[in-house]
């Protein structure tokens, strides 16, 4: 049974404040504060350490390990599939290029066989209707052009005007030349109207038609009469295979005293006395600039 003093002392004890108790409680709070981070960091460190190696051996750690394993397995399978696709694509491209090359070689072989063989008019008509033969027609035209080009350049090349020194040389030039060679001889004398123009034209045409043999000779060298010299010059004689196929006297009557290479060329082409020339190899007389002769001061436009 409590006395009045106990009650008074007890109430005092309940409301009594001790500094030592406060210090003890502060120490406990600090200890708990220091221990909290250590305990909170433990689960994070227990999840994964290194590359996919779980430190936590509990159920959650086993599940995470399994998920990581399946993820790596899926990535590896996808990489293998991509590598397989790249390999298949590479092999298909190489096979396709090889097949294309064989097909192109076979096509060229077939075209060559067609070109080498003889074509009838019926076959030519059928090829015009067939789109696949368009390439063959182009190839055929190209080969024909090459053949014509070779025929054009076959035989000797002259490219200049030759001076005949004597009457005997005049006869040898006609008789001893190849039968396929076309020979044009300008008979001239200095001071005759049209002679200088003819000399300049011959120089230009000799460069344009290298397979044609252009020559000139004085009328006095071949023993022509004075009457022929006065009335027939300038004269142009054309021979082939030893035969006279063209004889034009007093050319100034047709071309005038002042004419150009293009005029003489057109005049000879009108009579069919000039061969076909390759337009791509030599510049046309119509587009030539200026022709100079060592023996003449005449300028040809």
From Swiss-Prot:
Predominant location: other
InterPro entries linked to this entry: Phosducin (IPR001200), Phosducin-like_reg (IPR051499), Phosducin_N_dom_sf (IPR023196), Phosducin_thioredoxin-like_dom (IPR024253), Thioredoxin-like_sf (IPR036249)
Origin, by domain of life? Eukaryota
Record-annotated Phosducin domain positions: 36-299
* Location in the cell: Cell projection, Cilium
Give the GO cellular component terms, alphabetically.
cilium; cytoplasm
Q: According to the UniProt record, where is the region Thioredoxin fold?
A: 158-301
Question: Which Pfam families did the record assign?
Answer: Phosducin (PF02114)
Positions modified as N-acetylthreonine? 2
Specify where the region named Disordered lies, as residue ranges: 15-60
Q: Which residues carry this modification: Phosphoserine?
A: 20, 25, 226, 293, 296
One GO MF term on file is: protein-containing complex binding
**Composition bias, Low complexity:** 36-49
Gene Ontology biological process terms in this record: cell projection organization; heterotrimeric G-protein complex assembly; negative regulation of protein refolding; positive regulation of smoothened signaling pathway; protein folding; regulation of G protein-coupled receptor signaling pathway; visual perception
Assigned keywords, A-Z: Acetylation, Cell projection, Chaperone, Cilium biogenesis/degradation, Phosphoprotein, Sensory transduction, Vision
SUPFAM superfamilies noted in UniProt? Thioredoxin-like
Known function: Functions as a co-chaperone for CCT in the assembly of heterotrimeric G protein complexes, facilitates the assembly of both Gbeta-Ggamma and RGS-Gbeta5 heterodimers. Also acts as a positive regulator of hedgehog signaling and regulates ciliary function.
The text of the family note is: Belongs to the phosducin family.
On subunit structure and binding partners, the annotation says: Interacts with the CCT chaperonin complex. Forms a complex with the beta and gamma subunits of the GTP-binding protein, transducin.
Any idea what this protein is called? Phosducin-like protein
The scientific name of the source species is: Rattus norvegicus
């Amino acid at each position: 049974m409590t006395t009045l003093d106990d009650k008074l002392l007890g109430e005092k004890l309940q409301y009594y404040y001790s500094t030592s108790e406060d210090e003890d409680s502060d120490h406990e709070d600090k200890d708990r504060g220091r221990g909290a981070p250590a305990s909170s960091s433990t689960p994070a460190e227990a999840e994964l350490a290194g590359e996919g190696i779980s430190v936590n051996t509990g159920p959650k750690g086993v599940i995470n390990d399994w998920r990581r394993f399946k993820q790596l397995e899926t990535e590896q399978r996808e990489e293998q599939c991509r590598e397989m696709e790249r390999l298949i694509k590479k092999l298909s491209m190489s096979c396709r290029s090889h097949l294309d090359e064989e097909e192109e070689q076979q096509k060229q072989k077939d075209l060559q066989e067609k070109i080498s063989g003889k074509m009838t008019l019926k076959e030519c008509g059928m090829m015009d209707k067939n789109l696949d033969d368009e390439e063959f027609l182009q190839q055929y035209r190209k080969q024909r052009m090459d053949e014509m080009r070779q025929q054009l350049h076959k035989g000797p090349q002259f490219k200049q005007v030759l001076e005949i020194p004597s009457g005997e040389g005049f006869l040898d030039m006609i008789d001893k030349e190849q039968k396929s060679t076309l020979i044009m001889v300008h008979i001239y004398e200095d001071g005759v109207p049209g002679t200088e123009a003819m000399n300049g034209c011959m120089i230009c045409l000799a460069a344009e038609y290298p397979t044609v043999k252009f020559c000139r000779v004085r009328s006095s060298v071949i023993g022509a009469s004075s009457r022929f010299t006065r009335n027939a010059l300038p004269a142009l004689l054309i021979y082939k295979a030893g035969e006279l196929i063209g004889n034009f006297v007093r050319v100034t009557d047709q071309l005038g005293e002042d004419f150009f290479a293009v005029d003489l060329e057109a005049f000879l082409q009108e009579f069919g006395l000039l061969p076909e020339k390759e337009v791509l190899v030599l510049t046309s007389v119509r587009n030539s600039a200026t022709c100079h002769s060592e023996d003449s001061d005449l300028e040809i436009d």
